[in-house]
Swiss-Prot record:
It comes from Escherichia coli (strain K12). The gene is ibpB. This is Small heat shock protein IbpB. The lineage of its organism: Bacteria, Pseudomonadati, Pseudomonadota, Gammaproteobacteria, Enterobacterales. The keyword Transport does not apply. One of its GO terms (biological process) is stress response to copper ion. GO terms for cellular component: cytoplasm.
């Protein structure tokens, strides 16, 4: 029996839990910046991006429809450096997530090199049935 991990595919689909469980595995996911997607409960999620070396003004978060985009453009050093080892990335990036229909961004914070984007699922109130009265005379005069 084989087990397949579909989480790399579904990491960028937030709020589609049943779909995430049904799909699992396909393709490579973007490796920079590293990020986590945390589910607190059925209605609260948090995306955390590790952005060492970035400043708050280097970052932009945009929500367009159900597409959440995060972009980072770090200030480039004035002079070229010679690295003996470079393990920290300080490069521009663009990352996007597709949110479920009723997901909204409730806030974002940038603390100690971690960008936290909080999401909430707002389930719409079901529309109550409306009773229509039937009159004795026709609605249209013919």
């Amino acid at each position: 029996m084989r087990n397949f991990d579909l989480s790399p595919l579904m990491r960028q689909w937030i709020g589609f839990d049943k779909l995430a469980n049904a799909l699992q595995n396909a393709g490579e996911s973007q490796s920079f910046p590293p990020y986590n997607i945390e589910k607190s409960d059925d209605n609260h999620y948090r995306i955390t991006l590790a952005l060492a070396g970035f400043r708050q003004e280097d970052l932009e978060i945009q929500l367009e429809g159900t597409r959440l985009s995060v972009k980072g453009t770090p200030e480039q050093p004035k002079e070229e450096k010679k690295w003996l080892h470079q393990g920290l990335m300080n490069q521009p990036f663009s990352l996007s997530f597709t949110l479920a229909e009723n997901m909204e961004v409730s806030g974002a914070t940038f603390v100690n090199g971690l960008l936290h984007i909080d999401l909430i699922r707002n389930e719409p109130e079901p529309i109550a049935a409306q009773r229509i009265a039937i009159s004795e005379r026709p609605a249209l005069n013919s």
